[in-house]
Amino acid sequence: MITVNLNRTEFEYDIHSLLKAFFPKEDVEIYYTKEAHAEEKNVACTNHSAENETESASHFSITYEDKQISITCTLENQKPAECTFAVDFADRAETKNALKENLYYLLEEVTGQSLPWGTLTGIRPTKIPMQLLDEGKSEREVADYMKKTYLASDEKIDLSIAIAERERTLLSKLDYKKGYSLYIGIPF
């Protein structure tokens, strides 16, 4: 089991998803310090307070401070690893991407693994290239953005751009804005 201790409830889903991507066979339990309960009144019942936390061989502590986030990782039989990085909490998307990027690099360092989709978890991976292409970005600009922001592999970036282009071709023939959409999830 992997335990995660947070002092705020922000980005819990993203943290959980990224840890599960690196450790698919492990249960991941999220715990909160008392400060998180005081700040966030709507904490889900399935989450636990740090007081009830059981001793785990693998543990992460993520602390949100004024203008930075600190991550400490202790995996069984390994020396602890940590990183601290500056963030601007006013920009939620930028903060989330910085958190996921730094957590990813820390996980990559301690596990020796990398993920083909990088930090992209739980989303339709063609949504981002499709949006960027619709904004007039070139395929090269889209690829650079996905590599820099989401740390995706070249193979997966090329695949997502190719599928986004096919999707754009199909959608250009339909009046999808006044109709219905059906999404069928097919794993890549």
Language model: regions and residue ranges:
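A short, structured N-terminal alpha-helical element that caps or precedes a catalytic domain
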Residues: 1-109, 113-115
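Cysteine-centered iron-sulfur cluster-binding motifs in ferredoxin-type domains/subunits
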Residues: 185-188
